[in-house]
UniProtKB/Swiss-Prot annotation:
It comes from the Eukaryota. GO terms for cellular component: cytoplasm; extracellular space; intracellular membrane-bounded organelle. SUPFAM superfamilies: FMN-binding split barrel. The gene is CREG1. It is found in: Secreted. It comes from Gallus gallus (Chicken). Residues 1-18 form the signal peptide. Belongs to the CREG family. May contribute to the transcriptional control of cell growth and differentiation. Glycans are attached at N95, N133, N166. Keywords: Glycoprotein, Growth regulation, Secreted, Signal. This is Protein CREG1. The keyword Signal applies.
Amino acid sequence: MVLLAFLCAAALAALARGTIPPPEEAARMARFVLHNCDWGALATLSAQEGLRGRPFANIFSISDGAPGPGGGSGVPYLYLTDMEISVQDLEVNSNASLTVSLAQTPYCKKHRYDPQNPLCAHIIFCGSIVKVNDSEAALAKKALFTRHPEMESWPKDHNWFYAKFNITNIWVLDYFGGLKIVTPEEYYNVKP
């Protein structure tokens, strides 16, 4: 627990110092933002009556690994139940987008950046949600429960499962002048 508190404090200190990657390092910025965010807005195509085929966004807790500098796999893991409306959408069509933003961290508040200001970096991932296999479940569990310890006590009868966001496209908005495109290969090959 002391180690977790230290890692969280180190991550917050790095954000507070403003040690984010420079705008010309878009792949590194994408990894940095994802790793420093605890939640994101997941958008699906609704399968619900009256909303069928329309975009539907919902907030989900995420983690790519334990908090702290240099950590994280870059893979956004989620803890899901099919009782959740967005998960029901994903059972019909697993395609989704995930948006994460430094607006949820102290960084943008410290610099007085509005969440829509490009300097308050945000990343948009497109891809699909897939259940993790048994060999990856332990990694997903550790990544999620380290950041979100409350999850471990959620009702067992909800049939929770571990999933990951399988990234196919990445857009970075971290500076004025428009979006930057990062390939999944660039994203996973860069050191965060």
